[in-house]
Design a protein with these regions (language model features):
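Nudix hydrolase/Nudix homology domain
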Residues: 2, 86-102, 133-135, 143-216
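Extreme N-terminus nucleophile/cap motif
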Residues: 2-36
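Acidic, metal-coordinating catalytic segment for phosphate/diphosphate chemistry
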Residues: 22-69, 75-81
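Residue-level detector of short, conserved catalytic/binding motifs and their immediate flanks
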Residues: 58-61, 110, 149
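A short, structured loop/turn motif at beta-sheet edges
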Residues: 67, 122-126
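Conserved Nudix-box catalytic region and its N-terminal flanking loop in Nudix hydrolases
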Residues: 69-116, 120
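A short coil-to-beta-strand element that immediately follows conserved catalytic motifs
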Residues: 125-133
Length: 216
């Protein structure tokens, strides 16, 4: 019998103590160091975590940009979160499992897990883990038990391919096109696109740089 996946979580009451918000918050420095502290994290069976509203599952949500474009894809049936199937997304990432916990990690796996998730989801091998925002959406059942951490990554070329069946038709689209009509996006992507200028500005302030284009 296959062992059930165990995913990284923290108690919702911790979020309530820090200050509830709905949507996207740029105050990542207030939340991330606390909710990723080793003493505050635990791993739960995913089936239980999806139903237990006492906990929030930590989800890295990475925006990948290249030459004025952003990576967009459609959530396919191969993705584990059936409630998002068919929706467009600009965020790469997913649940951090106990297997993602680095042997010598002192953060119980968030930063190690974020890098591993990105390598598994798309063909991207090197990632800086600068976070620019956090996301909470208590308006939906799926959002109530998840907590997103937004990262911005710039790549030198568009040679990024989806490695999982849950990523359908990945393509880089101009930023203006991506933000023009957000009706077909999942809620977390809508939040990011609505605040995209602020996210990119914060990324620049934090030192996330645009790489030079590779020479052919």
């Amino acid at each position: 019998m296959a062992t059930e996946e165990r995913v990284l979580c923290f108690e919702r009451k911790l979020f309530e103590e820090l200050g509830l918000f709905q949507g996207l918050s740029l105050d990542v420095e207030k939340y991330l160091p606390i909710v990723t502290a080793s003493s505050k994290l635990l791993y739960l069976n995913r089936s239980a975590a999806e139903q237990d509203r006492r906990y929030k599952q930590l989800i890295p949500y990475v925006l990948i940009l290249c030459n004025g474009k952003i990576l967009r894809y459609q959530r396919g049936k191969g993705g584990q979160e059936t409630r998002l199937h068919g929706l467009c997304s600009v965020g790469i990432g997913g649940h951090i499992s106990e297997e993602d916990h680095g042997l010598f990690s002192n953060d119980r796996g968030y930063h190690d897990g974020m890098r591993r998730e990105l390598m598994e989801e798309v063909a991207l091998e090197e990632v800086k883990d600068t976070a620019v925002a956090v996301i909470n959406d208590d308006s939906t059942d799926v959002g109530y038990v998840h907590f997103g951490v937004v990262h911005v990554v710039y790549v030198a070329d568009e040679a990024v391919a989806g490695r999982r069946s849950g990523i359908v038709r990945p393509e880089f689209v101009p930023l203006a096109e991506a933000v023009k009509d957000a009706s077909g996006y999942e809620s977390w992507s809508r939040f990011c696109l609505e605040h995209l200028d602020s996210l990119l500005l914060k990324a620049a302030v934090l030192g996330v740089t645009v790489p030079e284009r590779a020479v052919a």
